[in-house]
């Protein structure tokens, strides 16, 4: 472990303490030491300090627990020189500190990590907004919708039954808390809450949607439906034996109100107002050129009123649709829903794994955006590897007409990015060519010329994936890149001459980490339709994407619509869409009339 020692010793205790600590650690300041040490070594240091301790001795030891947090291990000597966390007091104030939450809301919690609900809601809303911004989605309304959905996604946790259950859950929980994949909900692990499980009581996301409908009753936001969809569907909808109370607002409202025994609806409303005021106060600390809470937050309608709107459908395609134009008109709204939901769930997961202390520090320091460092795309060596590949072909076949034609095609495709930026259109292109013409090499050179960091190569069938994997790992192509195959049956990463047969199965935490990920359309669609994998859509939105043999997707019911949603989402990145549709026989009607792409 890495530890830091702080000395607040006085008089003769100073040299005695220094002799001990100098023997075990590096002095990094007049009164500070740091070292890597074992548990046994740390015990030895403590015992030696105790042997020489006097009333003037005061030494604290802190362990570096995480990248952002240290923990007090022990104090030897005069404990009054430090506070209970081992911090040296230097001043005091009678003013309210920025993150001192009012008494009425500081005990309203979001999860078993003890995060205050106000802080949790703001953090999720802020990070959801930042995700949309980082993905370069050219739609300010989407970023605002993600923010509003984020700050309201768990507002239903004001439910008194949830707060009572959570309080008792925290009393009996150990320190190593693992949050469930589908969030924290009332369950029967605590005695006395059987009547408030999901079978008989609304889940917090259902109550959140109900309250949000009331809060935004007067909103003029043109994308209000994306907000409600993101709130309601940030958790999966549970299967209930009797769903009659939970498939409409009136039933959820009735179940919720009937559960209010000791606390009135007016009291819940007062708490809601207080939490939203907290969120506004926190938001002022994050004001900058890209984020202004006052411009993003709507005008709330605080008087509770039961909505007459239906619950948000997961997909809004109409069962009665018969004309192609009817389906096409629903593609963009579904794509918008996907993006808002992706941002809210991803932000929620990032925030929920933090300790309450870490979250509080992020908010005090105004550095919450750094929490996204692990999910945003890193720079890779892929472009260098592709350049070596292309140069190798030119050196091996210096006067090859085939190479010249392929480079010309790649250059024409790459130039579409500049044209799209000038025209403010989307950089989604179609590459048509007969089998054996080198479409794979053209696609790689196109990626190189458009600043590639990662490629997600989507195939209609596993057999196509395996063929592509074989080609890309050949010595002439990208033997040193991390080429990942990710299908239902095969999950491997090949690099530096490792063969398919000898490569081990990819560990779960390594999924989608390759420089090039070869996968099937069903795996990519899972990023849309499943709650567990929706955060993988962030990878999809950041990467260069190649849809290989995409014409095979068009006759597949449902898949063709999901495919269209994916393309629509990428188109929202405008010239940064970096998406290529590859086929020997592209379906011109589908491309032009469904995907709305100029196939020329």
Region spans (language model):
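Alpha-helical phosphate/pyrophosphate-handling elements in metalloenzyme active cores
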Residues: 110-148, 158, 166-167, 171, ...
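Walker A/P-loop
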Residues: 422-447, 582-583
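Conserved pre-motif I regulatory segment
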Residues: 389-430
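N-terminal accessory nucleic-acid engagement/regulatory domains that precede
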Residues: 1-92, 129, 212-392
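Conserved Walker A/P-loop ATP-binding site and its immediately adjacent core
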Residues: 442, 447-477, 483-491, 585-590
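Short basic/glycine-enriched coil/helix segment immediately N-terminal to the Walker B
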Residues: 143-144, 423, 507-514, 530-543
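Inter-Walker segment of RecA-like/P-loop motor cores
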Residues: 344, 478-529
